[in-house]
Curated annotation (Swiss-Prot):
Protein name, as recorded: Target of rapamycin complex 2 subunit MAPKAP1
Assembly description: Component of the mechanistic target of rapamycin complex 2 (mTORC2), consisting in two heterotretramers composed of MTOR, MLST8, RICTOR and MAPKAP1/SIN1. The mTORC2 core complex associates with PRR5/PROTOR1 and/or PRR5L/PROTOR2. Contrary to mTORC1, mTORC2 does not bind to and is not sensitive to FKBP12-rapamycin. Interacts with MAP3K2. Interacts with ATF2. Interacts with MAPK8. Interacts with GTP-bound HRAS and KRAS; inhibiting their activity. Interacts with IFNAR2.
Location of the region described as Interaction with MAP3K2 in the Swiss-Prot/TrEMBL record: 2-184
SIN1-type PH domain sequence ranges: 382-487
Subcellular localization(s) per the UniProt record: Cell membrane; Endoplasmic reticulum membrane; Early endosome membrane; Late endosome membrane
Pfam assignment, any one: SIN1_PH
Length: 522
């Protein structure tokens, strides 16, 4: 037993003992900061002291220098000790035993007996491979199907079949489109071809899918193998191609467009459709006339009648009274609807209700068509803008941009930077559909530099009037252009407006007649 009174030596001895015996490390954690306290209690010696003092304290500080154990670190992980070499060796032996279990040792033994060359040859005997004669048995169902569908193998548009969405309805976004084919004959072009495409397909992919389905169904005539030779145009419900708008961009996705009816047109014939604009048939009716565009003279009179009725009734279903076509020069003689336009030798017809007749002089005042007038009528549907002044009742006139086309009339205010709108009401833009237009009349013409015209339209079951002023030439052109548009469209609002106007006129005439009658009796 040893008696020690030096705390530094005692602390070093305790730490060395716990390094080999304490697995928890708690004693090291408790005694780790004790050296700091000892350093405070034993300050370093001041230079200049005697050598005896240094030698006297060297024995005491020797234990203090080695008091800190090499296995104890003053850090956040002081409670975690490294594994001993024995534990690491035992772990390595355990893993080696597990690996030995997975391995299988096979002892190699050489044979003393030698095999002959004949025995070795019999082990790998060469077999004779004879070609089997072709069996003349029954054909498989796959072979029969391939022979029955030769067009499927020779379809040059097979790469676009992956965009067919008929098998993906309900699981993937698809789009159903009715496609008219103007290159068909007159009978087949009336019925569209329904195509179901993937919503992620582009317009170019849709064109290829249409060509693939067209070829797979064995339709005639055959298409060009190059998909780039075709384009998609907007089409009406009856298959008429709307050439006022350009074709769809082939690089755009098809879901970007909301049209459910399209037409497949050849690119070289798409701009050439203007050559067909000279073929127009005039259909006279009770409240005006309509110009029906036809592709050629082989069209039947039944198709012309259907187009005239649709132009007259708009988007409504063709129902109600039945109509027939008569030549303008031959009243009360119906035209055979199965005959072609070429066999009629006429370009002007009259639309008459069944079980009715027309007088010989009906529509004769408009029977003679001037070529210049027809050209003005056709160009009246093209968009053109005019700068005019809009007249208000309780405030000054405002400058507006009046845009007129065959579909609508747009009134956009012209912003003037110099004019202050702080104390005046700002003019709002107005858009009027041509089906709601009723009349356009010249109100007054004071001088060649000043004229006023009135525009009447239907708004929420009420007729509203707008007044504009400009020079006489501009006003005359606007009135003529709008009236050409109104005459070429069978508008219900326009017919009701004139009927109401006629009733008011009859009521005034009847009232004035009764007033004159009473004054005569007195």
């Amino acid at each position: 037993m040893a008696f020690l009174d030096n705390p530094t030596i005692i602390l070093a001895h305790i730490r060395q003992s716990h390094v080999t015996s304490d697995d928890t490390g708690m004693c090291e954690m408790v005694l780790i900061d004790h050296d700091v306290d000892l350093e405070k209690t034993h300050p370093p010696s001041v230079p200049g002291d005697s050598g005896s003092e240094v030698q006297g304290s060297s024995g005491e500080t020797q234990g203090y220098i080695y008091a800190q154990s090499v296995d104890i670190t003053s850090s956040w992980d002081f409670g975690i000790r490294r594994r001993s070499n024995t534990a690491q060796r035992l772990e390595r032996l355990r893993k080696e035993r597990q690996n030995q279990i997975k391995c299988k040792n096979i002892q190699w033994k050489e044979r003393n007996s030698k095999q002959s060359a004949q025995e070795l040859k019999s082990l790998f005997e060469k077999k004779s491979l004879k070609e089997k004669p072709p069996s003349s048995g029954k054909q498989s169902i796959l072979s029969v199907r391939l022979e029955q569908c030769p067009l499927q193998l020779n379809n040059p548009f097979n790469e676009y079949s992956k965009f067919d969405g008929k098998g993906h309805v309900g699981t993937t976004a698809t789009k159903k489109i009715d496609v008219y084919l103007p290159l068909h004959s007159s009978q087949d072009r009336l019925l569209p071809m329904t195509v179901v495409t993937m919503a992620s397909a582009r317009v170019q992919d849709l064109i290829g899918l249409i060509c693939w389905q067209y070829t797979s169904e064995g339709r005639e005539p055959k298409l060009n193998d190059n998909v780039s030779a075709y384009c998609l145009h907007i089409a009406e419900d009856d298959g008429e191609v709307d050439t006022d708008f350009p074709p769809l961009d082939s690089n755009e996705p098809i879901h970007k467009f909301g049209f459910s009816t399209l037409a497949l047109v050849e690119k070289y014939s798409s701009p050439g459709l203007t050559s067909k604009e000279s073929l127009f048939v005039r259909i006279n009716a009770a409240h005006g006339f309509s110009l029906i565009q036809v592709d050629n003279t082989k069209v039947t009179m039944k198709e012309i009648l259907l187009k005239a009725l649709k132009r007259r009734k708009g988007s409504q279903k063709i129902s109600g009274p039945q109509y027939r076509l008569e030549k303008q020069s031959e009243p009360n003689i119906g035209v055979d609807l199965e005959s072609t336009l070429e066999s009629q030798n006429a370009w002007e017809f009259c639309l008459v209700r069944e079980n009715s007749s027309r007088a010989d002089g009906v529509f004769e005042e408009d029977s003679q068509i001037d070529i210049a007038t027809v050209q003005d009528m056709l160009s009246s549907h093209h968009y053109k803008s005019f700068k005019v002044s809009m007249i208000h009742r309780l405030r000054f006139t405002t400058d507006v941009q009046l845009g007129i086309s065959g579909d609508k009339v747009e009134i956009d205010p012209v912003t003037n930077q110099k004019a202050s709108t702080k104390f005046w009401i700002k003019q709002k833009p107005i858009s009027i559909d041509c089906d709601l237009l009723c009349a356009c009349d010249l109100a007054e013409e004071k001088s060649p530099s000043h004229a006023v015209f009135k525009l009447t339209y239907l708004s929420s079951h009420d007729y509203k009037h707008l007044y504009f002023e400009s020079d006489a030439a501009t006003v005359s052109e606007i009135v003529l252009k709008v009236n050409y548009i109104l005459e070429s469209r069978a508008s219900t609002a326009r017919a009701d407006y004139f009927a109401q106007k006629q009733r008011k006129l009859n009521r005034r005439t009847s009232f004035s007649f009764q007033k004159e009658k009473k004054s005569g009796q007195q």
